[in-house]
Amino acid sequence: MSSVTTSGATRSTFSFARIWDQFGMLVVFAVLFIGCVIFVPNFASFVNMKGLGLAISMSGMVACGMLFCLASGDFDLSVASVIACAGVTTAVVINLSESLWLGIAAGLLLGALSGLVNGFVIARLKINALITTLATMQIVRGLAYIISDGKAVGIEDERFFTLGYANWFGLPAPIWLTVACLVVFGLLLNKTTFGRNTLAIGGNEEAARLAGVPVVRTKIIIFVLSGLVSAAAGIILASRMTSGQPMTSIGYELIVISACVLGGVSLKGGSARSPTWWPGS
């Protein structure tokens, strides 16, 4: 009889621990949010909620890409530098070409190239992600200072500012773009072969390779995606600041990684849940 009771208690404890592991951050977030609503005047006002949404929109976009890096067992320390350099590149190209779309394309291309370099060096050359992305972080940040001559680059085309200040259905555009990223990356992680391959690589890279998973290609794509969303966040930030600034977002990579980890993403890889970065933010 006692053994049955002990077994039941063990199962109950294990079940609670697993539920807490999956939803603990959501519970903490809910408690803090309710506490702020009760004790902080006007906290739940629509204006304040919009401000909070804008505050986490950039980190949210970048966290969508970082989530895949962490799920595969790696991480990307270059995201903050890509944010700054993409904003500067976009500003310079818009001013030189007088083309809004060419400037945005140049910023996104820079992010994709940065991710491609990271992915190739890490996946093909087998160099540690810490060393690789730390080097890329310094190189891309230096490139931002070179392109901008160490100064903020003002943007002359005022149409570009609508990207950061436009309101769609009553909410700022960056919030909608972040929600779109969350949905797209969530479907990519949970509903596609690419997402399953990412988790398999993070769980056991050698076993995934033996099972036929294209490890090198998958890792390269992951880092390209991380570079792209970081560049997109940098372009939106430049739009809101009305200039590209090479010194912005310093240390931002730690905020993004913390948001993912606090949201339940494992630093060891193989475990990730796409909607969980926002409580960490």
Regions found by a protein language model. Give the residues of each.
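Transmembrane alpha-helical segments of polytopic membrane transport and secretion proteins
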Residues: M1-G24, A44
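Alpha-helical transmembrane segments within multi-pass membrane transporters and channels
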Residues: S97-T136, A180, P279-G280
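Interfacial loop-to-helix junctions that mark the boundaries of transmembrane helices
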Residues: F14-Q22, F46-L54, S97-L102, L163-W176, ...
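Transmembrane alpha-helical segments in multi-pass inner-membrane proteins
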Residues: S230, R240-S281
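Transmembrane helix-bundle core of multi-pass membrane transporters
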Residues: L125, A129-T192, T218-I221, R240-S249
